[in-house]
Amino acid sequence: MNTSAQATTVLDLPVRQITGAKILPLPLRGRIREAHNAGIDKFSLDERISYLRRYGDHCMSFSAMQPGMHYFDVPGIGYIAYKMQWGSKFVLADPVCDEKDREFIISEFLKDGKGTAFAQISEPVAELIAEKFGYYSTQFGVETIVDLEDWNLKGKKKQVLRTSINKAQKDGIHFIEKDHVNGDRKLTDEWLKTRKVRNREILFLIRPMDMDYEEGTRRFYAYKGDELLGFIYFDPIYSDNKVVSYVPNISRFSHNFKQGIFYPLMVYAMETFKSEGLRYMHLGLSPMVVDDKDLYYESSIVKKMIRLLYKYGNMVYSFKGLHFTKSRFQGTDCKTFCAHKEKLPIKSFLSMFKLANIL
């Protein structure tokens, strides 16, 4: 099977299907019993971590451990992570549970009747929410996944990777993995001043740099001599109590080093993970990158707005630049969706921007 065919038939599947993990669903009687014990923020940290490690196969499952989140917890099944904004619930990522329990836990979660929207959910969950609960599920980006087993630096589109690696070597840049470096926050403060959304970090859709729970994260740094030039934090992606992938969720770089070191630092980390036997590498979300064709459960109005934002909104956020950067790694793009009740969810969009610290 060639690489593109393999990507189409394998990489667009959930991680549990890719890895072959088999987890039996809870019997129906047990589901009903556990539903009576469901509640908000019921699990202890250890209990939540146990579900995360078993079912946290979405690239944002770990990010949903960020401060300020609430959780709809169903003992024996799993949880849904969300935040409140202006009286509505905003879910981040797929439910952390077995695939077979998704419909049940979403149904229980929606029973309180509060306005609810879903952000950065996978295509199977988006389709489920549309078909079973009457939501619009609209694509709002792609997530890129790289198969490390077949990945290398060959090919025309990877020329920029090879060039950046050669330049870093020539300039005496060295890379290292460390647990913590004291200059992280200082470099972050300097980096934020150069961003289009200045002097504040994007939240919710991107987890904060400092988390109360960071077990399993990996940090890679770039130096020239003793000068810290940049770093990337990688969060683990789990399935059946094993790390099956990593995703870069925090990256910061010195504005004093114009040549750029994101590419060579990423390649260094990817080669490290590959040497450890890791099969996949998630590159995370490229927002506003959507198909030209609308699915039957998408809002055509929202989809059109997203296309226009990608085309004309780069003065607010570098949508095109981010997608171009990730495309150089030649991974497979998987659709990412938001789900909303209204055909034109203006309040939900404004609430999401507020949650994300953009407004």
Region spans (language model):
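Short hydrophobic short-linear motifs embedded
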Residues: 10-13, 18, 26-28
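A conserved beta-strand-loop-helix scaffold within acyl/acetyltransferase catalytic domains
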Residues: 32-90, 119-139, 149-301, 316-330, ...
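Short active-site oxyanion
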Residues: 113-117
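A cross-kingdom signal targeting lumenal/periplasmic-facing segments of multi-pass membrane
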Residues: 141-143
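A short acidic, glycine-rich active-site loop
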Residues: 306-316
